[in-house]
Design a protein with these regions (language model features):
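Compositionally biased terminal segments of proteins
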Residues: 1-178
Length: 178
């Protein structure tokens, strides 16, 4: 993690919003555990619709600037209210993204939440294995080099088994094992 990310985490870690079902995940959370790369953003997931009416004013009171997500238009076309599913902010040059787990495999994974707290604060960080599984899902669903790098670190550190990876792949691709 960069010093900027650490400073922003220190600013947000005890906010009241983290009393809700919000969990620190993503490459920075993975890096927190295994120190495999420098990460410059903060991802927060919720298994539920985001409580945007709470999150937005609290983040703005800290000086965070809300930015639009590139999927906003698509969400509106689908009849959804974007702020319930994704919120992005910039605070001290660090991107903070809150998102609702909307894929069935993500929702299923988040039903068995195991977490610890970040630096003994209100900010909950998913356990390493759950973070790794969410990163494997991201790896299979988008084309970002950092996901490939994280996937390699997950394999190298034996965080999830080959069977877990195969199962995730099957669920995402809707492949039968028969």
């Amino acid at each position: 993690m960069t010093s900027s990310v650490i400073n922003v985490l220190n600013k947000i870690k005890d906010l009241d919003i983290f009393e809700d079902d919000l969990y620190f995940v993503g490459g920075t959370a993975l890096s927190y555990f295994i120190k495999h790369r420098v990460s410059e953003d903060i991802d927060i997931v919720s298994p539920k619709i985001l409580k945007y009416k709470n999150i937005i004013p609290i983040m703005q009171d800290l000086g965070a600037k809300k930015i639009e997500d590139e999927n906003t238009f698509s969400l509106r076309l689908a009849g959804m209210f974007p702020d319930e599913y994704i919120l992005k902010f910039i605070l001290d040059d660090v991107k903070i993204e809150f998102f609702c787990a909307n894929r069935p495999i993500q929702k299923e994974l988040l039903k068995q939440i195991q977490f610890t707290t970040y630096d003994n604060s209100r900010l909950k960080i998913l356990d390493l294995k759950q973070i790794a599984k969410l990163k494997v899902i991201a790896f299979f669903q988008r084309d970002k080099i950092r996901d490939l790098f994280d996937f390699g670190a997950i394999l190298e550190n034996k965080i999830v088994s080959f069977q877990d990876i195969l199962q995730i792949s099957k669920e995402l691709k809707n492949i039968s094992s028969e």
